[in-house]
Amino acid sequence: MARLKDMYKSEVAPAMMEKFGYKSVMEIPKIEKIVVNMGLGDSKDNPKGLEAAVKELGIITGQKPVVTRAKKSVANFKLRQGMPIGAKVTLRGEKMYEFADRLLNIALPRVRDFRGVNPNAFDGRGNYALGIKEQLIFPEIEYDKVEKLHGMDIIFVTTAKTDEESRELLKLMGMPFAK
């Protein structure tokens, strides 16, 4: 079992139950899924760049990414409907906990002059979005083999009803929020 899942069951769940006074164990919020999205604005003309980004995202998450395509044509961006514009991965279960563990304990501390993540990036329904500027913070990515730096969005989807519950859940799981 993933380390973070063990921690959730042994420490986080009881602490949440005590703080928010849930009557049932099923009321305790948990992370439902983590969506990792990589937008590749300029790679629409470069199929090799798309391939490299998809491969890197696969290495980072341990799961094959889905190539996202443009829904509509936008003339200003020289974009046609159906063109590949990014890649995303939805992680659930064991892989989700393993990825979260690697992100919180290995990758985020490697960010240059890191002071914590934005504590206000909740969406009002208990989900948290986190933006990363470059994929090099993950140890699985080799610096020499990277053609181009890509940022990514990481969205933690939780079963929490409010942002307060979600913030507490992520804080107890080790999310380094900025003061």
Swiss-Prot record:
A GO BP annotation: translation
Domain of life: Bacteria
Keyword tRNA-binding: yes
A cellular component annotation (GO) from this entry: ribosome
NCBIfam families for this protein: PRK00010.1 (NF000585)
HAMAP family: Ribosomal_uL5_B
UniProt record similarity statement: Belongs to the universal ribosomal protein uL5 family.
Described purpose of this protein according to its UniProt entry: This is one of the proteins that bind and probably mediate the attachment of the 5S RNA into the large ribosomal subunit, where it forms part of the central protuberance. In the 70S ribosome it contacts protein S13 of the 30S subunit (bridge B1b), connecting the 2 subunits; this bridge is implicated in subunit movement. Contacts the P site tRNA; the 5S rRNA and some of its associated proteins might help stabilize positioning of ribosome-bound tRNAs.
Record's protein name: Large ribosomal subunit protein uL5
Upper lineage: Bacteria, Bacillati, Bacillota, Clostridia, Peptostreptococcales
